């Protein structure tokens, strides 16, 4: 049996998709809403932007000026040196002023690689540690190990937060344990900035590599305690500066200043794999393994064949490395030790 279309008689013209109860004067877009209620909408937008920028203010303008007066960058300025991309900051809503409780943690994108980062904000409580931000730091360190990405630590801490009592030690305890768990799993590059004592000196040395610029200090205690306990006058540089630490092997690399230390960390990172399951980055080369290099042949001949005492002649191995590796590109660790 044939059933006719329900609207074949032309009744469709009596129907409409428009809502007869709609109020046409209501704003239909975000822009229209902003114009319709400008005060409340703009107030919320401005407040949102203010909250996003609040963490970067740290402990306030006056403390940032003090940091600059000492010739030091803030933690946010150091992050900007490491990457031009906007960092993905994690756990930053800790603290009454969204200051991250004195520690900034996040994920950076450095030349296409994800890198976990933490950095003490010295403008907030002198970057000191308590149980709260210690748990936050441990969480960030373990996250790097779980995701198989390198870790960069920017240490600028006065040590445990004294008013917290033993809570400061609890914070370091969690961070120490986390560092041991990722050891050998992902590479960690630690940088020393400012004046670090106590736990602030213990923690970074547990990393894979340690870089210290000039005009910085880290040690279990400072010169004043040495003077009181031993009656010996000693400067911070003599006790815990980059020169003494480089010669003893505590520090792997030294730098002229903070900027040099950060750039050294970036170059070191370019030689390292993301984790122990992946190969290190490599660059294509047009050189052949069996290729003859005239400069290399001359160097070997002058050192061994033409020397009066043959293999007993002392030589600078760095000259050989420059000839053996592609384009003379290699990265020396602990150059001042021994």
Show where each model-derived region lies.
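Amphipathic alpha-helical
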Residues: 67-93, 294-332
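N-terminal amphipathic, basic-rich helices that act as targeting or association modules
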Residues: 12-109, 114
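Non-catalytic terminal/interface segments that mediate subunit docking, oligomerization
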Residues: 93-119, 123-125, 131, 136-141, ...
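Short, Lys/Arg-enriched N-terminal segments with co-localized hydrophobic residues
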Residues: 1-11
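Terminal amphipathic helices with adjacent charged low-complexity linkers/tails
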Residues: 257-314
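Cleft-lining beta-strand/loop regions that shape enzyme active-site pockets
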Residues: 109-180, 189-193
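Conserved catalytic cores of soluble enzyme domains
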Residues: 14-15, 155-277
